[in-house]
Swiss-Prot record:
Gene behind the chain: gshB
Binding site for Mg(2+): 280, 282
Source organism: Ralstonia nicotianae (strain ATCC BAA-1114 / GMI1000)
EC category: ligase
Signal peptide residue numbers: none
Name of this chain's protein: Glutathione synthetase
GO MF assignments: ATP binding; glutathione synthase activity; metal ion binding
Length: 324
């Protein structure tokens, strides 16, 4: 099996916690060939979507962790699976990449997650499709509506629609301190749409990342507990990860969403759940594989590659494409 990973620069990888690295390591352990490219290398030429793909061999060393082979210009149809693992922001370059990947799909490439499904599921807005699991929420750039929402709820989280890692998230309490400044800053004076949600006190127990793989939930979540004085549990914002079994409510949410999202072409999804409420549906490059595995022994990457084998094999009727 030949797998192409579309990734950020390898120099940015922190392999002790990187989920893409965990995928690569599991694939390599099964004898699969690993190739990488960057988003900027995707090209449509002569109506064929191709990229400069670099073969990668993992060394097992913590620092000098890979050896690169000679880069080759190859069509995406030459791989058994193409994994889009580029981190947000989900900007127009990201959208353009999904268009190119969708063309490659029509040419026979097998791309995960499905490019159209990535576009169709804004990581913040997708929760609106599952309203029975969400806290009170408003999405607008109208300052008056945002102020009214705050007056109704009393304690509100404001966040941009295109952020990641907890960037740009603000809490405004019942006293309304800095409400105007937060609204002006996040909406860029009314020119950008934002989300506001009722503050959920259960954030003190962690923002739970629940992974859905191939239509099934991983049995353990990673509760990302905020550091003192913070409302953001994101690991990138200083939160601490604590693996735990899915609660009864977690399972209800996960089992309701997993088959629906898988049917839409989303092989890997990261749900964010605070207390009893779904807050985000992450579809670009969900993470937390290694933290869950290290704390529980459950092989998340193994479950993912198992699902990838089934998905790629089902799409092709068998594995083993030959590169030109």
């Amino acid at each position: 099996m030949r797998i192409l990973f579309i990734v950020d620069p390898l120099s940015t990888f922190k392999i002790y916690k990187d989920s893409t690295f965990a995928m690569m390591r599991e694939a390599a352990a099964r004898g699969y060939a690993i190739y990488t490219c960057q988003q900027s290398q995707l090209t449509l030429s002569g109506n064929v979507v191709e990229t400069v793909a670099t073969p990668l061999a993992l060394t097992g060393d913590e620092h000098d962790w890979y050896r690169s082979g000679d880069p080759r210009l190859l069509p995406l149809t030459g791989f058994d699976a193409v994994l889009m693992r580029k981190d947000p922001p989900f900007d127009m370059e990201y959208v353009t990449s999904t268009w190119l990947l969708e063309i490659a799909e029509r040419q026979g490439a097998r791309v995960f997650n499905k490019p159209q499904a990535i576009r169709d599921h804004s990581e913040k807005l997708a929760i609106a499709q599952f309203r029975e699991f969400t806290a009170p929420t408003i999405v607008t750039r109208d300052a008056k509506r945002l102020r009214e929402f705050h007056a109704e709820q009393g304690d509100v989280i404001f966040k941009p629609l295109d952020g990641m890692g907890g960037a740009g998230i603000f809490r405004v309490g019942a006293d309304g301190m800095n409400l105007g400044s937060v609204i002006e800053t996040l909406t860029h004076n009314g020119t950008r749409t934002v989300m506001a949600q009722q503050y959920i006190p259960a954030i003190r127990d962690g923002d739970k990342r629940i992974l859905l793989i191939g239509g099934s939930p991983v049995p353990h979540a990673l509760a990302r507990v905020p550091m003192a004085g913070e409302v953001r549990g994101n690991l990138a914002a200083g939160g601490t990860g604590r693996a735990q079994l899915l609660s009864e409510r977690d399972q209800v949410i996960a089992h309701a969403l997993a088959p629906v999202l898988w049917q839409r072409g989303l092989l890997l999804v990261g749900l964010d759940v605070i207390g009893d409420y779904l807050t985000e549906v992450n579809v670009t490059s969900p993470t937390c594989f290694q933290e869950i595995t290290q704390q529980t022994g459950f092989n998340v990457a193994g479950m993912f590659i198992d699902a990838l084998e089934r998905a790629a094999g089902k799409a092709s009727g068998g594995l083993g494409r030959k590169l030109a």
